[in-house]
């Protein structure tokens, strides 16, 4: 039987500033004592997307307030915390630096150990926090900047078996929202618009379904939507609300079809591990899309697997997942020192080759 451990965690890799306090009991159960998330939607709304410089300044201004709020909500203090955890990458470098510097300051001032956590590991391990999913499990990590299939065999054992070779679905949703003059963030806007639309009105491609493997591509789908939109604007002088809804529905249906087929293929590879309880997990901000969730649940059932999707609040960026990832690692990994660096790019599976088209500056994750 171990001892009780309490972790204060920080997350600031994109446009959500977050802090959380988690406690792992002597018998291994973990409680989220508090989880504070402060979004920046109003700061970026006028620009049609996240502006890194604005995001970084906002993180720097509010991180300490989030920490105070998280400690107060957890009814604890820095003195009672056993460790500090922080997202050290990947992400927008200004925001990651803000979080890392704040965490270093807290660690230095309190003498507490510091743990730099991969943001994607936080997402990938969340099903163990919410549902105590046993290893190994299959994870579809689908977020604003990332999309990959991972075989997860341990807290630090991730094997990528496929992913997007260009735009991640979250990026594609944001770009489609801009094309259709829908508000940002694009994911929820496109999903809302799609509910009123006819997905069959326009013929849109399902990229890479004619090729083997689990890799995906969404840039061609985005281009197809652009061409349809431009044709409508040329023919009728603009877009009507029904045009927006039908294009949203068609785009979303295409994304769902691609994710479903590629997930079925990934399930076949995963089943070769002969897991005791086959489990398909989905995490990341795009996993909040209910059309995607519903279809993936069907894929899991058709493949004889349990489907696990964390609550929506733990799918989008949060610090609770960072704290849990730290708790998972603390038993077998030493803490980081104060030379911990912020990393804009940090592949979870460093042994796999970089994805083709994974980014102009290298592999995102």
Curated annotation (Swiss-Prot):
This is tRNA N6-adenosine threonylcarbamoyltransferase. It comes from Roseobacter denitrificans (strain ATCC 33942 / OCh 114) (Erythrobacter sp. (strain OCh 114)). It comes from the Bacteria. Its main location: cytoplasm. One of its GO terms (cellular component) is cytoplasm. The keyword Transcription does not apply. It is an enzyme of class 2 (transferase). Its EC number is 2.3.1.234. Residues 342-365 are annotated as: Disordered. One of its GO terms (molecular function) is N(6)-L-threonylcarbamoyladenine synthase activity. InterPro entries: ATPase_NBD, Gcp-like_dom, KAE1/TsaD, TsaD. Required for the formation of a threonylcarbamoyl group on adenosine at position 37 (t(6)A37) in tRNAs that read codons beginning with adenine. Is involved in the transfer of the threonylcarbamoyl moiety of threonylcarbamoyl-AMP (TC-AMP) to the N6 group of A37, together with TsaE and TsaB. TsaD likely plays a direct catalytic role in this reaction. GO terms for biological process: tRNA threonylcarbamoyladenosine modification.
């Amino acid at each position: 039987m171990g001892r009780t451990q309490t972790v204060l965690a920080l997350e600031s890799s994109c446009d959500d500033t977050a802090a959380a306090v988690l406690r792992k009991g002597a018998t291994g159960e973990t409680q989220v004592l508090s989880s504070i998330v402060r979004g920046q939607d109003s700061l970026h709304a006028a620009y049609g997307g996240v502006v890194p410089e604005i995001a970084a300044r906002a993180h720097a201004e509010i991180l300490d307030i989030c920490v105070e709020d998280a400690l107060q909500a957890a009814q604890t203090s820095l003195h009672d915390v056993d460790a500090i955890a922080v997202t050290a990458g990947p992400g927008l470098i200004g925001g990651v630096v803000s979080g890392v510097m704040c965490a270093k300051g807290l660690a230095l001032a309190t003498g507490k150990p510091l743990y730099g956590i991969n943001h994607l590991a936080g997402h990938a391990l969340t099903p163990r926090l919410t549902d105590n999913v046993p290893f190994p499990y299959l994870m579809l990590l689908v977020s604003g900047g990332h999309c990959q299939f991972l075989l997860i065999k341990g807290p630090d054992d991730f094997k990528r078996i496929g992913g997007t070779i260009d735009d991640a679905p979250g990026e594609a949703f944001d770009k489609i929202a801009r094309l259709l003059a829908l508000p940002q963030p694009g994911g929820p806007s496109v999903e809302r618009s799609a509910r009123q639309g006819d997905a069959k009105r326009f013929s849109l491609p399902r990229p890479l379904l004619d090729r083997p493997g689990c890799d995906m591509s969404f840039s061609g789908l985005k281009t197809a939507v652009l061409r349809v939109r431009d044709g409508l604007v040329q023919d009728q002088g603009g877009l009507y609300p029904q045009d927006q809804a039908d294009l949203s529905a068609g785009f979303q249906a295409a994304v769902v079809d691609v994710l479903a087929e590629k997930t079925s293929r990934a399930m076949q590879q995963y089943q070769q591990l002969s897991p005791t309880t086959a489990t398909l997990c989905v995490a990341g901000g795009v996993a909040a899309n209910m059309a995607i969730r519903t279809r993936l649940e069907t894929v899991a059932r058709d493949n004889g697997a349990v489907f696990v999707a964390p609550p929506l609040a733990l799918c989008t960026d949060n610090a609770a997942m960072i704290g849990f990832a730290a708790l998972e690692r603390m038993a077998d990994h030493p803490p980081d020192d104060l030379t911990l660096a912020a990393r804009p790019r940090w592949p979870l599976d460093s042994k796999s080759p970089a994805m083709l088209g994974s980014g102009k500056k290298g592999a995102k994750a």
